[in-house]
Amino acid sequence: MDERITLGVTTDGYTDRVLRHSESLARTDVIGAGSGSPDREDATFVVRRGLADSSCYSLEAANEPGSYLRHSSFRVRLDADDGSELFDRDATFCAQPGAEGGSVRLASVNELDANVRHYAEEVWAAVDGGPHAYDRPESYAADVSWRVLPALAP
């Protein structure tokens, strides 16, 4: 707990991308050690004990203390903790083994079968084969698998 990390994409052709927040939305971008400090900070999260389930995790933005990745209408975004039970559930994810060796899948605690997925540079709580474009089954397993990397920002 309380470890600073960066999450990297595992999908072939996109492994140079990492999860970050930008203008209150989660997305993926090409960010590395040589990128500007603001971008590296946006791609660094502090792993916290899950707000809704202490056996799971919440990801707090390292550069915006008190703000967490959460899903709202399935879109993953960064919002300040409002103290509500709904926020706590939206911002809690349980780590499961990912499709790639050593990767992790982040399963939503309050959206059945939904996992944090990158899709067209955006990040969603997606269900394999669900009704939305971001739920498409093609590359789903890879798209919901993330590499835990050393934090890009100290």
Descriptions of predicted regions:
Residues 1-154:
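Lectin-like carbohydrate-binding module/patch detector with strong preference for beta-trefoil
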